[in-house]
Structure formats: structure tokens, C-alpha cells
Amino acid sequence: MTTILTDLSSSLSCHAASKDSPTLPESSATDLGYYSTHGGTHSPHDYYQNQPYSQPISHYPYHQFNLNGLGGPGTYSPKSEYPYGGGYRQYGHYREPAMAVQEPVTVKEEPEPEVRMVNGKPKKIRKPRTIYSSYQLAALQRRFQKAQYLALPERAELAAQLGLTQTQVKIWFQNRRSKFKKLYKNGEVPGMEHSPDNSDSMACNSPASPTVWDNNTPSRVQHTQAQPLPHNSSPSYLEDYNPWYHHPQNLSGPHLQPPGTMHHTPPGTGAVY
């Protein structure tokens, strides 16, 4: 009896100890032989070398190795997982003809040489002259009478109104100023007979000099006295020609006197009534 009790107690103690401290089962000789044979004969390099990653089945080599064990290699295609892959591949096909079309355009846009050989001598090529319409010339001449120099905003506004470029307006004003200076030096400043509507692009319509106004002052003064202008139009007329109209009145001369003093002079002592 004592031997049976001791055997039962020893078996129970061994069973309780095994539950408290679980340990891995000891590897047998066959297990060691299994892992040693596979681990010794196959290296990681040999494993990856035997895989068919060099075959053109998929564009992504890591798709052929299923790490989760759900399927064999090559089960996922790049189009299902990356739908934009085809679009990027097709972009190269669209890009090649576009570049081929742009090549002749860049050749045509090259500027022509400014100097050409004519009879063995270099000759500079000039751009064609700009032909202004009568409306454009009239507007430019009216603006030149007001101011011979334009600021950048004024030049841009005038060019937009006339349908010209700012460079064309600037060159026109430069030519007009040079022509005016040349005529002024020669004493050939034209009068008001050159109206702004004149189509001659080289005519200078600057404000007239006081000497031109001296000849026309009596007729103009008599006309204003006989037929007075309306009240609304006379101030604007005098404001436009204020520096040119009032300046000759300060000069002395019988032709600058008012019509009343010029035609009704006081009689002398020996005058006959």
C-alpha cells in the first residue's frame, strides 16, 4: 500500500510541475536531421535563385512571393492592384509624337538674320513701315497737340483705343517731335491750316506761333463781336487756347486793339464835322 501511495503522489507532483512550467518538447534526432539537411543544403541565395522572378510574368518581382501563404507566386497582376500603371505606360506613347510635332515649330520660330549679303556687301534688313489709318492719324495728331510726351499709362490707353502697340505709339511720337524741332529751327512751323484730320503722317500740327495769330486776330475778334458764341462753348474755347489767345493782347499795335477803339478814334482839333 505504501508503495502505491508513493507512486500516486509522485505522479501527481510531476503532473502539477509540468502544468506550472511548460517547456518545449525536446527535439529528437530525426528533427535535428531534418532541419540540418534542409538548412545545410539550401542557402538563402540558392532559394531566391531558384525562384522564377526573371520571367516576364509580372512587372513587380515581389508579387511572385506570397509571404502569407494565400496563393502561389504570380497570382496578383499589376493592373488589378495598380490601375494607373497602364496610364503611365501609355503616356510615353503620347509624348513621343508630341515632341516630334514641336520640333519643326521651333525651327520656324528662329529669327531671320538681320544682315544679308547683297552683291557681296552686308545689308541690314529693316522692318516694314507701319501704315496708319486716317482715324489713327487723326487721334494721334490731336493727342500730340495736347501733349508732346506721354506717360506710360497714357500711352497704353491710347494704344488700346487705336488698336496699336505701345511701341508703335512711342515711335510715332518720337518721329513727330523730331519733325517739329526740325521745322521750328528752320522757321517753318505750320499754322492751323493743317487740320488734325490731315492724312499726311509727316505733317506737324503743333500749336501755332503768336505771329500767325497776329494776322488772323482782327477777323476773329470782329466775328466774335458780331456773332457771340453760346455761353457753354465760349469758356471751353478760351481754356483750350488760353496761352495762345490772350498772349497777343498784351502786345502793342493797332491791329490788336478792340474793334470799338480801332474804328471810332477820337477826332482831332482840326477835324471837319
Swiss-Prot record:
Keywords: Developmental protein, DNA-binding, Homeobox, Nucleus. PROSITE patterns: HOMEOBOX_1, HOMEOBOX_2. It holds the Pfam family Homeodomain. Its main location: nucleus. Residues 125-184 bind DNA. Expressed in regeneration blastemas. Detected in forelimbs, hindlimbs, the tail, flank, and brain as well as in limb and tail blastemas. One of its GO terms (biological process) is epithelial cell differentiation. PANTHER family: HOMEOBOX PROTEIN, HOMEOBOX PROTEIN DLX-3. This is Homeobox protein DLX-3.
